[in-house]
C-alpha cells in the first residue's frame, strides 16, 4: 500500500496512490471475519483486525507527531495525572489515511453497536453514515476532534480510563499499533479491565501488532448474567513501556466537548 499523502496541494499521482490505499483498506476490512470479531468482542471486550497498514505507512503516520500544526492540543499525561507520556488530538482536518480508516471501520462496527444496544434495552441513535452521526455530535455540543496520536517512551504508561466526552457516545473504538512490538519497543501492552457483575474485575493485556487495529469497548458492553444481559463497565489503558518508543493511533467514533 502507498505512503501517506499531504493534507493539501497533493499531486495527481499522490492523490491516486492515496485513493488506492483507501481502497485496499476498505477491501481488507470487507474481507475480515466480522462474525468472529464480534464473537471475540463478546468474550473479551476487544478483538484484533487483519493488518490494515504496512510498516512504511505506520512510520509515516507516526512521524506526523512532529508536525504540531496538524493537532488542536497536546496532553502531557504526567501533568494531568493520566500516567506518563504524551498524546495529541488531531484537528478536524484529518490526514487522509486517518479519516479513511475511521470511515472504513464504521459500517462494520455499526451492526455490533446496534446489537449491543438491543441486548441492553438502549436506544441505538447511530445512523448509517458516520458524517451524519458526527453532525449530531456537533449539534449536541461535542464538536472537537477526538482522534489522537500517542507517543510513549521508556517508563511511560497510561492510566485506566474511558474516552467519554458527553452524552453522544459510540460504544466501540479502535487503536492501531504503529511500531513493531518486541522490536521497536517492549512492554506497553494494551490493557482492558472489565468490572463483572458481583465478581472481581477481569484484566486483559494485549500486544498491538504493527499495522493492525484493536477494536475495543468504549464505556461498557453487554455481558451474560442470570437475568439475561447486564452492563459490564470497561476501562482501558497502557502498561509501562520497558524500552524503545511506542506510537499508536486512536480512532474514536464520537467527538469531544
Regions found by a protein language model. Name each.
Residues 151-153, 167-184:
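Short, conserved beta-strand element in jelly-roll/cupin
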Residues 47, 142-154:
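A short glycine-rich, His/Asp/Glu-containing loop-to-beta-strand
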Residues 147-149, 174-176, 249-253:
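A structural signal for short, well-ordered beta-strand segments
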Residues 1-43:
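Fe(II)/2-oxoglutarate
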Residues 54, 154, 243-244:
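Short strand-connecting beta-turns/loops that link adjacent beta-strands
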Residues 170, 181, 185-257:
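Catalytic core of Fe(II)/2-oxoglutarate
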Residues 36-134:
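Non-heme Fe(II)/2-oxoglutarate
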Residues 158-165:
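Histidine-centered catalytic micro-motifs
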Amino acid at each position: 500500500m502507498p505512503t501517506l499523502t499531504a493534507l493539501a496541494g497533493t499531486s495527481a499521482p499522490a492523490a491516486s496512490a492515496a485513493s488506492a490505499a483507501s481502497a485496499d483498506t476498505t477491501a481488507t476490512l470487507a474481507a475480515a471475519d466480522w462474525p468472529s470479531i464480534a464473537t471475540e468482542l463478546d468474550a473479551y471486550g476487544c478483538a484484533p483486525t487483519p493488518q490494515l497498514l504496512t510498516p512504511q505507512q505506520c512510520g509515516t503516520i507516526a512521524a506526523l507527531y512532529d508536525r504540531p500544526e496538524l493537532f488542536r492540543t497536546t496532553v502531557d499525561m504526567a501533568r494531568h495525572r493520566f500516567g506518563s507520556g504524551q498524546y495529541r488530538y488531531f484537528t478536524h482536518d484529518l490526514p487522509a489515511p486517518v479519516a479513511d480508516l475511521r470511515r472504513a471501520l464504521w459500517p462494520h462496527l455499526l451492526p455490533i453497536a446496534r446489537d449491543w444496544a438491543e441486548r441492553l434495552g438502549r436506544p441505538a441513535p447511530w445512523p448509517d453514515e458516520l458524517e451524519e452521526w458526527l453532525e449530531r455530535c456537533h449539534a449536541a455540543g461535542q464538536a472537537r476532534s477526538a482522534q489522537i496520536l500517542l507517543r510513549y517512551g521508556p517508563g511511560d504508561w497510561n492510566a485506566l480510563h474511558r474516552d467519554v466526552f458527553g452524552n453522544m457516545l459510540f460504544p466501540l473504538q479502535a487503536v492501531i499499533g504503529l511500531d513493531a512490538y518486541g522490536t521497536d519497543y517492549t512492554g506497553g501492552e494494551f490493557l482492558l479491565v472489565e468490572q463483572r457483575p458481583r465478581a472481581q474485575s477481569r484484566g486483559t493485556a494485549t500486544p498491538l501488532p504493527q499495522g493492525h487495529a484493536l477494536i475495543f469497548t468504549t464505556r461498557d458492553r453487554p455481558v451474560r448474567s442470570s437475568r439475561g444481559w447486564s452492563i459490564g463497565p470497561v476501562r482501558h489503558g497502557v502498561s509501562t513501556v520497558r524500552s524503545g518508543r511506542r506510537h499508536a493511533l486512536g480512532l474514536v467514533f464520537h467527538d469531544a466537548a
